[in-house]
């Protein structure tokens, strides 16, 4: 197959950041994706309806002329979140609330430290039809970074899912066989997103031959057996798994430093890279479900009606992109060849 046409996809997990960065990130995503779930981990985090409304306006103002791209907004759960916050956020158009364990990722220090205390909030979310998005890692310093996702499932996620059968839960950016198996065996109210980097790479691509800071993300890349499990699960075409890039921009100097930031900025190449993975797996017929159908179906939103066409044509991801402030950013897969290209995009 040398050409494939899909219903226009959505990105069910990304980071736009704020300020000048929006002039880069919003057009990059709006190029191909009709909607995106926007993460709330700004400084300060987006925790209530007023902050969401203001952030959404800043995103809309950064859309290219004529764009109909729609940001789908989220709020950041803290131990101070109340049922009224959920009600107000829902009224403001928020579709989901994000659970970050404190310290798990960029700008998550304000996040949840006592998970059980949030059970009344989860109850309110189920009642009011708001999804729970989960960064599924424990953060205790004595737990090995490669084991934190599996430990989170065992310690917390299994309990949340069992306690709230009416709550839709998205286990975001899963990285392990443990997570894939958990989602596959869970009830229909549980789904997961998978990033391009966790399908394309494993921890050798981060650490062999030198540290590769632009492949560093959280949750961290795992061993190849976990990568293969993720690839196998998308090849099944299961509706429990859908596209979420976790595209997460950081300026070049913040990645290439003594304490480099976590995140892969994949917006300019994500759909093409997913196509490459599905092609390699002999499962191109499953790409549209993953990219365009399973996400809106799970969220209870209409599928898009426009289409995007990809052709089998080689191109090279740019080595860097200059941000509006003049500083460079290195995109994911920089300088690498990609086998699929969007037609007329």
UniProtKB/Swiss-Prot annotation:
Pathway: Pyrimidine metabolism; UMP biosynthesis via de novo pathway; (S)-dihydroorotate from bicarbonate: step 3/3
Binding residues annotated for Zn(2+) 2, in chain numbering: 98, 135, 173
InterPro entries named among the record's database cross-references: Amidohydro-rel, DHOdimr, Dihydroorotase_CS, Metal_Hydrolase
Catalytic activity: (S)-dihydroorotate + H2O = N-carbamoyl-L-aspartate + H(+)
Record key words, sorted: Hydrolase, Metal-binding, Pyrimidine biosynthesis, Zinc
Modified residues (N6-carboxylysine): 98
GO BP terms: 'de novo' pyrimidine nucleobase biosynthetic process; 'de novo' UMP biosynthetic process
Name of the protein described by the UniProt record: Dihydroorotase
Organism: Shewanella halifaxensis (strain HAW-EB4)
């Amino acid at each position: 197959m040398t050409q494939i046409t899909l219903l226009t996809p959505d990105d069910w997990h990304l980071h736009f950041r704020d300020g000048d960065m929006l002039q880069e990130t919003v057009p990059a995503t709006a190029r191909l994706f009709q909607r995106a779930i926007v993460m709330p981990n700004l400084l300060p985090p987006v925790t209530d309806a007023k902050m969401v409304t203001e952030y959404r306006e800043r995103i809309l103002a950064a859309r290219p002329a004529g764009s109909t791209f729609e940001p789908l907004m989220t709020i950041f759960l803290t131990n101070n979140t109340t049922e009224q916050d959920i009600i107000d956020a829902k009224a403001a158009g928020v579709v989901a609330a994000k659970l970050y364990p404190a310290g798990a990722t960029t700008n998550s220090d304000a996040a949840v430290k006592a998970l059980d205390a949030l059970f009344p909030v989860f109850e309110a979310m189920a009642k009011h039809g708001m999804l729970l998005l989960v960064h599924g890692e424990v953060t205790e310093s004595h737990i090995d970074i490669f084991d934190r996702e599996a430990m989170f499932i065992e310690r917390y996620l299994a309990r949340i899912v069992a306690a709230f059968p009416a709550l839709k839960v998205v286990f975001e950016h899963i990285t392990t066989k443990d997570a894939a198996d958990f989602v596959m065996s869970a009830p229909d109210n549980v789904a997961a997103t998978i990033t391009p980097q966790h399908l394309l790479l494993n921890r050798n691509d981060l650490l062999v031959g030198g540290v590769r800071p632009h492949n560093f993300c959280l949750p961290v890349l795992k061993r190849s057996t976990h990568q293969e499990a993720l690839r196998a699960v998308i090849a099944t075409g299961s509706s429990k798994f859908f596209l979420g890039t976790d595209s997460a921009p950081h300026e070049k100097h913040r990645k290439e430093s003594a304490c480099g930031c976590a995140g892969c900025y994949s917006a300019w190449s994500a759909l093409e890279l997913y196509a490459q993975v599905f092609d390699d797996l002999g499962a191109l017929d499953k790409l549209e479900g993953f990219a365009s159908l399973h996400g809106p179906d799970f969220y209870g939103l209409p599928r898009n009606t426009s289409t995007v066409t990809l052709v089998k044509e080689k191109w090279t991801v740019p080595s860097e992109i200059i941000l509006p402030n003049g500083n460079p950013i290195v995109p994911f897969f920089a300088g690498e060849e990609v086998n699929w290209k969007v037609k007329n995009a």
